[in-house]
Amino acid sequence: MQLQEIFQSYSTFGFSGSRFSSGVLPPNVLSSAAKSVPKGSRVVIGCQKGVDAFFRQCFPNAEVFSVASGKWGSGKGAYAARSIACIKAVADDSGLWISFPASECPPGLIPSNKSSQCFSGKGSGSWASLAFACGLGVSCLVYSPFGIPDSWNFSHLPDLNKWFSFYQRTSINQLSLF
């Protein structure tokens, strides 16, 4: 299965990832994800450098969740609050969360629908965001050179090297009453 096939099932996309992507995340991987977003889709992105900046360039009409707006307070906590709001925007639209962490998952971090358990100072906003998205039941795709902890219940995508998926099944196959 290719990215385009997966992305066609969604109309809202959230992108997240490392502030320092060079050397770990190949530019062609980021580009292929950007090119897979169907035209007219809603795209939500954070305000950081690195992966956020790349997708802001690709999608000039994206909704940018910016800490500088003051909407989420100030200091480090504002970045977590901003990320939580961004993830909830994707969750509310049954969208797809796409993550590009540039490090291994911090020990002890697991998916949870409680933001305080995900954003608990373990050291990686990318992984914290992914843990919260999964905890909320958001469908997720991850490009990770480091893999995903087994306890997260992600599947490796065999046709896509270093890509992993977690699908909320009802997002892909709508249940029918008739």
Descriptions of predicted regions:
Residues 2-12, 17-162:
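Acidic/glycine-enriched connector segments
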Residues 161-178:
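SAM-dependent methyltransferases
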